[in-house]
Amino acid sequence: MKFNKAYVLMRQGKKIKLPEWQGFWAWENNTIMLHCSDSVVMDIRDTDDVSYTFSFICREDWLIAE
C-alpha cells in the first residue's frame, strides 16, 4: 500500500513495515518511532540520514506488521 494509507493505519495504532524489514514503524507519543531489527528504537526526528529515512515514504509496498 502507499504510505498515505499506511500512515492513516499507523495513526490508528497499527505497526507498519516494508517487506524486507525485520523492524517496523509505529505511532507513539505523537511521533513515528522506528523499531529497528537490532532492538534499537528511535524517534524518526532523530535519524542520522533524513534523506535515506524519508525515501521510504515514496514506496508503495507498505504492509501492516504482524
Regions from the language model: what does each represent?
Residues W25-T53:
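Acidic, low-complexity, intrinsically disordered interaction modules
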Residues S55-A65:
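Short, structured beta-strand segments at or near domain termini in extracellular proteins/domains
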Residues M1-V8:
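Surface-exposed ligand/attachment interfaces on beta-rich extracellular proteins
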